[in-house]
Amino acid sequence: LSFKYLQTKTQFSKEIMVNYSSMDRFYDNLDMITEQCQNRGPHFVVGHSMGGLYALHLTKYLRVVGGVSISTPFRGSSTADWAKYVVPSYPLFRDIGRKSDPVKKAHEIKLDIPWTQIVSTTGSVPYHNGPNDGVVTLASMTQRTDMEYIEVPHTHY
């Protein structure tokens, strides 16, 4: 299900649908998202994949009361560690690597609010380091100890 579809089926009146570009750097996108959401709230955040990393970082800047992340690589991506050399012009690979600044700073964020990570477990690709959903390893999705995990037999998408 897409977020747009869910939006048509709910009666929420204060949701903020934020889009960002993977061609922009992480912190440029984070600044844009924070600006769109400031002076509103409290916020319950939902993010898929890299969007979950943005959602986690938003807890530092907004009054976030809870969150759901879906297939988020909280430990980063070993694939991105080498892919950034193959496609150096694509900022996403530099931002989601295991030693990238957004991932390292995410390790410093300690959650004290309800948070659920939905872990997708189907769709393995052989060149990732370990079991994965076709994009993110299960180890990266389950790296944090301060959230609840729900496993679903589904691919990353």
Show which residues each predicted segment covers.
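Short, structured coil segments at secondary-structure junctions
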Residues: Q11, L62-R63, Q143-T145
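Serine-dependent carboxylesterase/thioesterase catalytic core
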Residues: E15, M23-D112, V125, D133
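C-terminal catalytic-base region of ester-bond hydrolases, centering on the histidine
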Residues: I109-Y157
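Glycine-rich His-Gly loop
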Residues: L1, S49, S120
